[in-house]
């Protein structure tokens, strides 16, 4: 399965719908957390935008609150964190309409260098779990909010 980052704005804010490039402007402020992925995405994709930077270790919900309260225009959020925030704070934010995820990350495991045989064994086991539907069942059972993770597309569809 995959984790994805999306752009979130205040509910009712349509300025960036179908044109996220408008965000790359000094008049718009992006809420980021130092050292967190949102700060790297902002620097690479929206370098001209203003930044509301919060210190490392700040809870991600503070980026959400900064947008909801009007201190920032946009937050770059992991879809699963945003879904949990919206479950607890309905109607405060929304994903920018017409925008694909700004980043997609395959969930992986770190292994010791030189563990090629272990890695290959795990790859086969994980593919088997994905193809059998087991991973989807586990995600459905444990996701705080349904569909807050992106599923892997199966190579053969019927």
What positions do the PLM features span?
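Flexible hinge/capping segments at coil-to-helix
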Residues: 10-30
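Short amphipathic alpha-helical coupling segments at ligand-binding clamshell hinges
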Residues: 26, 78, 114-128, 134-138
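Hydrophobic residues within well-ordered alpha-helices
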Residues: 23, 64-68, 109, 122
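Short helix-initiation/N-cap motifs at beta->coil->alpha
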Residues: 15-18, 52-66
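A ligand-binding cleft/hinge motif common to bilobed small-molecule-binding domains
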Residues: 40-44, 68-69, 73-103
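Periplasmic-binding protein-like
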Residues: 1-9, 87-126, 145-158
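Ligand-binding clefts/hinges and TM-proximal coupling segments of bilobed small-molecule sensing domains
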Residues: 35-52, 93-95, 126-158
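Short secondary-structure boundary segments
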Residues: 11, 34-35, 79-80
């Amino acid at each position: 399965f995959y984790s994805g980052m999306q752009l979130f704005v205040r509910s009712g804010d349509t300025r960036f719908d179908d044109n996220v490039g408008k965000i790359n402007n000094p008049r718009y402020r992006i809420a980021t957390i130092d050292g967190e992925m949102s700060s790297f995405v902002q620097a690479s994709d929206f370098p001209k935008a203003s930044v509301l930077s919060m210190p490392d270790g700040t809870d991600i919900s503070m980026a959400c609150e900064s947008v909801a309260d009007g201190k920032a225009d946009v937050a770059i959020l992991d879809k699963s964190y945003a879904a949990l925030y919206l479950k607890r704070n309905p109607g405060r934010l929304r994903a920018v309409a017409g925008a694909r995820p700004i980043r997609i990350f395959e969930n992986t495991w770190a292994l010791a260098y030189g563990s090629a045989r272990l890695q290959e064994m795990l790859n086969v086991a994980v593919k088997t779990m994905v193809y059998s539907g087991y991973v989807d069942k586990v995600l459905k059972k444990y996701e705080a909010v349904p569909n807050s993770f992106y599923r892997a597309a199966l190579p053969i569809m019927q």
